[in-house]
UniProtKB/Swiss-Prot annotation:
The lineage of its organism: Bacteria, Pseudomonadati, Pseudomonadota, Gammaproteobacteria, Enterobacterales. S-adenosyl-L-methionine binds at residues 42, 62, 83, 127. It catalyses: a 3-demethylubiquinol + S-adenosyl-L-methionine = a ubiquinol + S-adenosyl-L-homocysteine + H(+); a 3-(all-trans-polyprenyl)benzene-1,2-diol + S-adenosyl-L-methionine = a 2-methoxy-6-(all-trans-polyprenyl)phenol + S-adenosyl-L-homocysteine + H(+). This is Ubiquinone biosynthesis O-methyltransferase. Belongs to the methyltransferase superfamily. UbiG/COQ3 family. NCBIfam families: UbiG. It comes from Pectobacterium atrosepticum (strain SCRI 1043 / ATCC BAA-672) (Erwinia carotovora subsp. atroseptica). Disulfide bonds: none annotated. O-methyltransferase that catalyzes the 2 O-methylation steps in the ubiquinone biosynthetic pathway. PANTHER family: METHYLTRANSFERASE (PTHR43464), UBIQUINONE BIOSYNTHESIS O-METHYLTRANSFERASE, MITOCHONDRIAL (PTHR43464:SF19). It is an enzyme of class 2 (transferase). One of its GO terms (biological process) is methylation.
Length: 241
């Protein structure tokens, strides 16, 4: 399948950036260590807010190497992982095979997937992906189209302000070296009010928002009410829309 230049809502520099380090996706001490460390928090939040994942049809948009997708499959969900990076998907498929976990990995844009699979999923997750595409609002609209009436959609991204720049870029990339330099661009960060405005233009309705915090002194992540930097938004499809 030739996916190059298929859509304007793909940043090929972003794709190349993650493909270059895809082989280390499951290295717990490598570039993706923060994703491995926050994954239990993400999984717990999603599972709790969606009232469990067992037996549900789930789509993970921007799945990368499959960290979240695999963990949801282990919870008993029927998971499809969607990404535009060929190398991360290959890593994800191999790791799932080695781990004995079943996930259907697909190289396709979320917009194209929505055109073919409208209303198919009970749960859609879009984690740490919106800040890596040219048109994040288009992704929000596609996610809303993909979920069943009454289903759940989860977004996570980074707030756009001076504190987020200091912590997510200067702190995480240059001082603590938690993620590779160039991973983030503050111009692509998204304020909660912006994300909620995009959500309000769809049949989705906001249900809950939480911040994701890193404590430098304890070297631990936790969920909390402050959404100044990283945050997760739970929405559900309004059956009346």
């Amino acid at each position: 399948m030739n996916v190059e230049n298929q859509t304007p809502n793909v940043d090929h520099q972003e794709i190349a950036k993650f493909e270059a380090i895809a082989s280390r996706w499951w290295d717990l001490e490598g570039e993706f260590k923060p994703l491995h460390r926050i994954n239990p928090l993400r999984l717990g939040y999603i599972s709790q807010r969606a009232e469990g994942l067992f037996g549900k049809k789930v789509l993970d948009v921007g799945c990368g190497g499959g960290i979240l997708a695999e963990s949801m499959a282990r919870e008993g969900a029927d998971v499809t992982g969607l990404d535009m990076g060929a190398e991360p998907l290959q890593v994800a498929r191999l790791h799932a095979l080695e781990s004995g976990v079943t996930v259907d990995y697909v190289q396709e844009t979320v917009e194209a997937h929505a055109d073919a699979h409208s209303g198919l999923y009970d749960v859609v997750t879009c984690m740490e992906m919106l800040e890596h595409v040219p048109d994040p609002q288009s992704v929000v609209q596609a996610c809303a189209k993909l979920v069943k009436p009454g289903g759940h959609v989860f977004f996570s991204t980074i707030n756009r302000n001076a504190k987020a720049w200091m912590m997510a870029v200067i702190g995480a990339e240059y001082i603590l070296k938690m993620v590779p330099r160039g991973t983030h661009d503050i111009k692509k960060f998204i304020r909660p009010a912006e994300l909620m405005r995009w959500v309000d233009d769809t049949p989705l309705r906001e249900r809950h928002i939480t911040g994701l915090h890193y404590n430098l002194l304890t070297d631990r992540f936790k969920l909390g009410p402050n959404v100044d930097v990283n945050y997760m938004l739970h929405t559900s499809h309004d059956k009346q829309c």
